[in-house]
């Protein structure tokens, strides 16, 4: 009988894309693969093209701020644990891999209740709430940054591995990307990535500066689901998408510079592709500040140009783009010196190792 694995993680693309990289490796090796995500999260849409069984469970959002919805979330989480536990009793996988996000916690606990080993992964410099809560129930947690070790008590559970990178991103075709947008080679391309859910501040800034931007660049704008601007359809030198999946590799290949949020998964993919970039981390007012930490780290290495979200204006962005283009060769060399590699093989080895280990006592 073939070994089996269940993946979980969702809420945003950053909690799904590393899973996609790993899923493809396990399927190559003949493993049975299934996925547990939230009922209405983006993970279902992203996993669907892989043609693997997807199971939706209830999940609470684990908010860090007051909301009346917080009163219902504990009940949703308990329901998610029960649903996950019943699924695991039926599926009986050898191991579970969790990429975090609010759906992950009930799934991890459900696996623990069924004595199924769990490996988790944290991409950011400081762990998210789901991974902090999940830590007592996992066998191993893989970290992208060594700095993340200080947040966990049991150091024997920790492996610093880096981040899995989708290999298909490294094989994009520049001409296909240009054709997809109706562009040519007359100007460099600027790729704007606001995250899978979009980024209102980035979208507004790009559109307010569009005339100046298109005088220097051809602009590819990934603006998020439901965030397209119909008034800008047909504007020369501007192409907008809600989200890019299979096309993303070609869009990256066509681009000379990238504007992005500073989630660790997206950032590592940008670095693996060697793209000069501007990072606009999510404000600490609406997040735990993880993206700010990521951005500051690479800014300190002289690799990333960073604009704080609260300071984002058209003139600030245009000046930052000039700075990046002026220092492009220097930035290129610094990115190459990092030698960013995918952690897929390392993490696959850890998962296989844990697939033959009993689950830990809660500590």
Curated annotation (Swiss-Prot):
Highest taxon, organism lineage: Bacteria
Pathway assigned to this chain's UniProt record: Cell wall biogenesis; peptidoglycan biosynthesis
Listed GO MF terms: UDP-N-acetyl-D-glucosamine:N-acetylmuramoyl-L-alanyl-D-glutamyl-meso-2,6-diaminopimelyl-D-alanyl-D-alanine-diphosphoundecaprenol 4-beta-N-acetylglucosaminlytransferase activity; undecaprenyldiphospho-muramoylpentapeptide beta-N-acetylglucosaminyltransferase activity
One cellular-component annotation, GO: plasma membrane
Enzyme Commission number, as recorded: 2.4.1.227
CDD domains in the record: GT28_MurG
Gene3D superfamilies referenced in this protein's UniProt entry, alphabetically: Glycogen Phosphorylase B
Keyword Cell inner membrane set for record: yes
SUPFAM superfamilies: UDP-Glycosyltransferase/glycogen phosphorylase
Catalytic activity: di-trans,octa-cis-undecaprenyl diphospho-N-acetyl-alpha-D-muramoyl-L-alanyl-D-glutamyl-meso-2,6-diaminopimeloyl-D-alanyl-D-alanine + UDP-N-acetyl-alpha-D-glucosamine = di-trans,octa-cis-undecaprenyl diphospho-[N-acetyl-alpha-D-glucosaminyl-(1->4)]-N-acetyl-alpha-D-muramoyl-L-alanyl-D-glutamyl-meso-2,6-diaminopimeloyl-D-alanyl-D-alanine + UDP + H(+)
Swiss-Prot/TrEMBL keywords: Cell cycle, Cell division, Cell inner membrane, Cell membrane, Cell shape, Cell wall biogenesis/degradation, Glycosyltransferase, Membrane, Peptidoglycan synthesis, Transferase
Membrane topology category: Peripheral membrane protein
Localization terms from the record: Cell inner membrane
Biological process, per Gene Ontology: carbohydrate metabolic process; cell division; cell wall organization; lipid glycosylation; peptidoglycan biosynthetic process; regulation of cell shape
Stated role: Cell wall formation. Catalyzes the transfer of a GlcNAc subunit on undecaprenyl-pyrophosphoryl-MurNAc-pentapeptide (lipid intermediate I) to form undecaprenyl-pyrophosphoryl-MurNAc-(pentapeptide)GlcNAc (lipid intermediate II).
Similarity comment: Belongs to the glycosyltransferase 28 family. MurG subfamily.
PANTHER family the record matches: UDP-N-ACETYLGLUCOSAMINE--N-ACETYLMURAMYL-(PENTAPEPTIDE) PYROPHOSPHORYL-UNDECAPRENOL N-ACETYLGLUCOSAMINE TRANSFERASE, UDP-N-ACETYLGLUCOSAMINE--N-ACETYLMURAMYL-(PENTAPEPTIDE) PYROPHOSPHORYL-UNDECAPRENOL N-ACETYLGLUCOSAMINE TRANSFERASE 1
Protein name: UDP-N-acetylglucosamine--N-acetylmuramyl-(pentapeptide) pyrophosphoryl-undecaprenol N-acetylglucosamine transferase
Annotated source species: Legionella pneumophila (strain Lens)
Gene: murG
């Amino acid at each position: 009988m073939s070994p089996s694995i269940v993946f979980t993680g969702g809420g945003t693309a950053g909690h799904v894309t590393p899973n996609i990289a790993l899923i493809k490796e396990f399927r190559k090796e003949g493993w049975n693969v299934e996925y547990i995500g939230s009922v209405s999260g983006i993970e279902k849409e992203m996993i669907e093209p892989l043609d693997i069984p997807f199971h939706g469970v209830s999940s609470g959002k684990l908010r860090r701020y007051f909301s009346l919805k917080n009163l219902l979330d504990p009940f949703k989480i308990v329901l998610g644990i029960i649903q996950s536990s019943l699924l695991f009793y039926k599926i009986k996988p050898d191991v579970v891999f969790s990429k975090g996000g609010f759906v992950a916690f009930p799934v991890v606990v459900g696996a623990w209740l069924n004595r199924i080993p769990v490996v988790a992964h944290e991409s950011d410099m400081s762990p998210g709430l789901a991974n902090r809560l999940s830590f007592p129930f996992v066998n191993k947690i893989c970290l992208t940054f060594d700095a993340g070790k200080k947040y966990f008590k049991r150091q024997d559970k920790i492996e610093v591995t880096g981040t899995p990178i989708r290999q298909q991103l490294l094989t994009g075709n520049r001409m296909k990307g240009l054709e997809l947008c109706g562009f040519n080679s007359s100007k460099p391309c600027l790729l704007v990535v606001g995250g899978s859910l979009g980024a209102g501040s980035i979208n507004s800034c790009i559109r307010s500066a569009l005339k100046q931007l298109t005088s220097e660049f051809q602009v590819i704008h990934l603006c998020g689901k439901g965030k397209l601007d119909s008034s800008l359809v047909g504007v020369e030198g501007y192409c907008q998408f809600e989200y890019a999946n299979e096309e993303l590799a070609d869009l990256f290949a066509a681009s000379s510079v990238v504007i992005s949020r500073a989630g660790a998964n997206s950032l590592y993919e940008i670095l693996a592709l060697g793209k000069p970039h501007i990072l606009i981390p999510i404000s600490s007012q609406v997040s735990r500040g993880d993206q700010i930490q990521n951005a500051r780290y690479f800014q300190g290495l002289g690799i990333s140009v960073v604009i704080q979200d609260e300071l984002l204006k058209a003139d600030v962005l245009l000046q930052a783009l000039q700075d990046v283009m002026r220092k492009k060769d220097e930035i290129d060399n610094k990115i190459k010196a990092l030698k960013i590699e995918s952690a897929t093989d390392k993490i696959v080895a850890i998962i296989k190792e844990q697939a033959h280990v009993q689950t830990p006592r809660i500590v």
